[in-house]
Design a protein with these regions (language model features):
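WD40-repeat beta-propeller superdomains and closely related acidic/aromatic-rich repeat-like regions
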Residues: 1-223
Length: 223
């Protein structure tokens, strides 16, 4: 599954050279598969929304549309409120949650079953303010896009910050009563030289990698 600068989303079979499906959808799409391979998501900046599709019905309408409306919280910071540029999309290990990362100072987690945004992740500094040339379709996104990921168990989100730290958010065991709930980073890791613009977690081992000007490997502190 791929998204292109011409606002197209294509479905590929690696055994053939031609795309098996081609969808035209305006809004600088960002795409991601869920772990089952049966559902995919498309994040659209121009609509501030995430569309969920059944892969078996590629050419039909999405079965869920998740709208990211953070006006109430963002209006306390700026007027008029502006949703940061969406730069990242990834599903949790169970497929229940989807992480919508932005270039700004907030990321979002939505429930794919209910279509509601359940968490706002704050405490970091967005990479739209980091040094470096833009790597995305929208220049004001800066170098944002790959600086966040889930842990393999789907219980934590890890993301880089323009200040050089790596932030960790732990998701509560039970969903909040009031949506969306704001989660501040529970842990901040130091040691990465420069801005960590890429963050990845080993799917099998307790081993994390971050990269920017240099590549850093992280292991847990064992008792």
């Amino acid at each position: 599954l791929s998204a292109a600068v011409d606002d197209s989303v294509r479905l590929w079979d690696l055994r053939t050279p031609a795309a098996q499906g081609n969808m035209r959808i305006q809004g600088h799409p960002i795409v991601a598969y869920d772990p089952s391979g049966l559902v995919f998501g498309i994040a659209l900046n121009e609509r501030s929304s995430i569309l969920l599709y059944d892969i078996r019905k590629f050419d039909q309408n999405p079965f869920i549309t998740i709208t990211i409306d953070d006006t109430a919280a963002l209006s306390q910071i700026m007027m008029p409120p502006r949703i940061p540029v969406l730069t990242h999309l990834s599903f949790s290990n169970t497929g229940q949650y989807i992480l919508a990362g932005t270039s700004g100072d907030v990321h979002y987690i939505a429930d794919t079953y209910t279509g509601k945004v359940v968490y706002r992740l704050t405490g970091h500094i967005g990479l739209e303010r980091a040094d470096g040339a833009s790597v995305g379709l929208v220049p004001k996104a800066g170098i944002s896009g790959q600086e966040m990921c889930w842990t393999p168990d789907g219980r934590m989100v890890i993301a880089g910050s323009a200040a050089g730290q790596v932030h960790v958010w732990a998701l509560p065991e039970h969903p909040p009563a009031t949506l969306p709930a704001t989660l501040h980073s529970t842990t901040t890791l130091q040691g990465q030289e420069g801005t960590p613009s890429v963050v990845a977690f080993n799917p099998r081992c307790a081993h994390m990698c971050t990269a920017g000007a240099q590549v850093a490997f992280w292991l847990p502190d064992l008792p």
